[in-house]
Regions:
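Conserved NAD(P)H cofactor-binding loop of Rossmann-fold oxidoreductase domains
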Residues: 88-93
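C-terminal helical subdomain
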Residues: 181, 201-238
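Residue(s) in the substrate-gating loop at a strand-loop-helix junction
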Residues: 141
Length: 266
């Protein structure tokens, strides 16, 4: 085996799809997730497909210190050196901002931002000084660069994740550690509510499969770029939002009535 890869949110669509592209590259894989039964099911499916692969799992809530510790202990006990951490675990949040309960805003921020930050900090303290190359890749979103109505709380988490990734990568410049950021566009996963799926269809939003995202991730992993956004025209709008944000605001304003309609059904 090449090296060890840890995938948080490993029981979900994108996490398990990424595992399927890493295993043929020689990685031993550790999957982490909160749903123990679902995690066991994913591991069983992967082992049926990849008979000789090293695939293990840790059921853990990474928003809790005990969960982070359990995953880190498992990784530290492996004879295979850690070379890749993929912070993929996350939660969606759709709705008009004033309608979202404060507890829900706090819960999603903890899952999407605080948990990956604290787990990464623990990895760096305990395993990051071994001198071996280590990549930490944070899975973000197009909504980490473009503020989108109906997703204000979710955007806040992904903007935070992107900024932290950029700052931390610069903090480790000149070392063997890299922190990178990979941003899918809308993806068909169980994180989407029925209202989100219906709204995307009404707006003509292209949604990628988890497998397509994983293929793009594999390409990104083999390169050297700090960050990548996938999908067209999303990449164009990411650029446009940087140079002419008012143009993007005008375009999105036309979608607000539809967004409000589906937000009321969330």
């Amino acid at each position: 085996m090449k090296n060890l890869a840890v995938i948080t949110g490993g029981s979900g669509g994108i996490g398990s799809a990424i595992a399927k592209v890493l295993i043929p590259q020689g990685y031993s894989v550790v999957l982490s997730g909160r749903n123990e039964a679902r995690l066991a099911e994913v591991v069983s499916q992967l082992k049926q497909q990849f008979h000789d692969a090293s695939i293990t799992a840790v059921a853990a809530d990474l928003s809790e210190e005990t969960g982070r510790g359990a995953l880190l202990d498992h990784v530290a006990a492996s004879p295979t050196p850690l070379s890749l951490v993929i912070n993929n675990a996350g939660a969606g949040l759709f709705g008009l901002f004033e309608d979202i309960p404060p507890s829900e805003l706090q819960r999603v921020f903890n899952i999407n931002v605080t948990a990956p930050m604290l787990f990464t900090q623990a990895v760096l303290k305990r395993l990051g000084s071994a001198g071996a190359d280590l990549q930490i890749i944070n899975i973000g979103s197009t909504f980490g660069t473009i503020g989108y109505p109906g997703f204000a709380g979710y955007c806040a988490t992904k903007f935070a994740l992107r900024g932290w990734s950029e700052a931390l990568d610069r903090e480790y410049s000149g070392s063997a550690i890299r922190i990178r950021y990979f941003a899918p566009r809308a993806t068909r996963t169980e994180l989407n509510t029925d209202a989100v799926n219906a709204m995307n269809e009404a707006l003509g939003v292209t949604m990628d499969s988890a497998e397509a995202v994983a293929r793009e991730f594999s390409t990104f992993l083999s390169g050297r770029r700090h960050s990548a956004h996938i999908g067209w025209p999303e990449r164009f709008f990411v650029w446009l939002n940087k140079v002419l944000p008012n143009v993007v605001s005008s375009a999105l304003a036309k979608q607000v009535p539809v967004i409000k309609e589906y937000a009321s059904k969330r």
